Structures are given as structure tokens and as C-alpha cells.
């Protein structure tokens, strides 16, 4: 599958079909999820209405981690097989990932004020997610600060792979340390069968998670398509300049 | 073959060691950068006292920052003068990286990890307890070694960047934060007399992975440079 997508032409054809479908699914599922979360789901007995920010905060945090994993996979693929599409995906993934991490952090801070009394605490979960934002930023800066584009891609790919160590820390930080941040309510398929969150609150969250997943898929594909188009333009310009 | 490799390594270690001593400004700056903020922290602590736990955590952070200061120059002169390219052609990059790493550890990581726990007690004005000092020294030493291993990779990573010093800070510090989290956890456990081995063993594991990975990864990056 990875090797089939390595051909830019085939990738462009396939992504042109996937992007509109993913965007439509994201909008439909997002509308259903938001209606379920903001209107149908009961308010929390402790946190009241403030808990509804969860329907944006949690999927954004999931996506922040998922995009970094995708960035790591694309980087490994680029370093091992030299797939140009993998490089385009990696280049597009870090700004999208940084945006979702920032959304997760900001919504978390907004949620923290009514539930903890403070917007920010230096506990392991919050700090490790902040580190994730810095890793995305470091990746963007490194990509743009090395003049040779191919060299920049290789070095940024190594940085992305080194940064993967942060993902398990984020995931298990709430279990390894005593944190103010609550433990995961649905950390695995087993927990999904017996979650610590009421079913009426859970289904909109899962629907929002799916909506965010399709949205991210569309954004990543669009970013990769943009990068491919940019490279083609550059090649055309160079050919025109020489001719 | 092994004898030839050992001789190459010995030659590079001697060279690195000489270069290091001929440029005392570089390593002295790092050492002073470590001592000065810690001394100022001691002064501030006399006015507004903080706990011993907080103090040792802050000093761990300063140790990493002091190490960061020395990283930018690690490969820069050799790269700019073209020597790195010659070593690449002679297939000596691996030996160069190991030599630089060993000299960095011997000249900076070890002095910082020895100074660290000494300064913690000096600044915090606490009575010396060997049962606390020894684990603390171990935490400082392993953190310094791990940070040096990471530092070699990030120094090579940022070599070709337009503003290498700034990029180095942006790349090195986020990668160091997981190390700091575990080091601070181990330091805190050592001070409180609880079990400090779980977080410390994570640091040791990190170091062992680093020992295996750092040289080939750095070599790959240096070979990619024009």
C-alpha cells in the first residue's frame, strides 16, 4: 500500500477522490457529534455545562498525537524508501499537528479554569503536550532553516523520529505520575466496553473523534497535494528558465 | 583491522582533546554558565527560601542549559574548514563522532555532574547526607551522559541551519524535556528517601539506546552535509 502511494501521480488521483469524501464525512459527523454533545448529552453533575468543551478538546488532543505518529511514519518511510510523497506528507503534517496541539492546549486551559480553578498547571500531561507543540515547531523551523530542500527533509525526518519518544510519555503520563489531569476514560478497547463515562456522553465524543479523524485526513492530503504542486511548479519554472 | 580502528580513534581523541584545551573559552563559558546562575539562585534562596526538592530540580535544568551552550561549536569549525568532508572521504566519521562524544563527556558532562550535587548542598545550605548525595550524584551523572548523547545528534542536525544556535535551542530542549522529567522524578525520590530506581532506570535505558543509535545517526547526517 505504502509503495503504491509512493507514485505522486497515483497519489494525486487517489487523494483527489478521498479529500471531498473525507470533508463531507467530517462535516456530517461533526454536525451530528456537536448536536449530540451540546444538546442531547446531559450536563456533568460536578462540572456542569463546562464539560461540553470536551467534545472539541479530547478529539483535538487525539489528533495531535495521531498526526505526530503519522509524521513519524512518513519520516521513516522517507528515510528508508526515499518516497517523495512521504516527504510531502511529513512537510504538511507538522503545521497541521501544531494547530491541533494548540487547540488541545487552549481548550484544555479554558476547561481548566472552571474545573481546577487555574488555566495551567505544570503536571506531566500538560507539560508533555506542550513539548509536543515545541517538537512540531522545531520540525517546522528545521525544515525552513536549511537551504538544501532534500537535506532539510532528511534532517527533519530524523528529528521527527527522535521526537516519537514523547508519544508514550503523553499517553501514559496520567498513569505514571500523580497529575491533576484526569486519567483516560477510554484508553483501550476493553475500557470502551466498560467506560468510566456515561453512554449518553460517550457516543457524541466518539462521533466527534471520527469527524476530527476525517478532517485531519483531508487536511493532510491537501497539504501533501499542495507540496507536490509546489514542487512541480518549481520544476516547470526551472525548465522554463533554462529553455 | 580492529587495531587500525583503535589507532584512528586514539588519534581523533588526542586531536579533540588538544583542540578543546586550546580553546578554553568554550568549555569555561559552559562551566561558568552552570556555576553563575546556581550561585545567583543561592543568593535568591537566602532571601526567599525554596525547598531542597525544588532547588535540586532547578539545578538539573541549568545543567542541561550549560551543556547546550557547548553544542553549537562541536562540529562547526571542522565543517566550515572542510576537515569533516575529508574525514568522510577517509571513512573516519564514526571515529570522529566517538572521539567528540568522549571528549564532551570527559570535559563537560562529568565535571557538571560532579559539580551539580556539590553545588546543590552549597546553595541550599543543607547538612550533607551521603545516602542522599550519592543517588543525587548518580542522577546528575546519568542525565549529563544522556544529554551529551542527545546533544551530539542535535548538534549535527542543526549544523546546516541558517541560524544554528536558535534552531539548536528549539530542537534540543524539547527532546531533553522527557529526560528532565525522569531525572527530576529520580532526584525528588532520592531527596525524599523513596525508591528512585524506576525513573532512574528509564534514564539508563535511554542512555543505552543512545549509545547504540547516536553514532550511526550522526554519521548519516554528517555524511549528508555538503
Protein language model features and the residues they cover:
Chain B
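Aromatic- and glycine-rich beta-strand/loop motifs that create alpha-glucan
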Residues: 2-30
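Membrane-interfacial helix-loop-helix connectors in multipass membrane proteins
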Residues: 46-54, 117-139, 187-200, 225
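Long, hydrophobic alpha-helical segments
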Residues: 55-75
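Short helix-to-coil transition segments within interhelical loops
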Residues: 86-94
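Selective transmembrane-helix segments that form parts of the transport pathway or gating/packing helices
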Residues: 93-120
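A structural motif at transmembrane helix-loop-helix junctions in multipass membrane proteins
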Residues: 140-173, 223-226
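Junction motif at the cytosolic side of a transmembrane helix
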Residues: 208-226
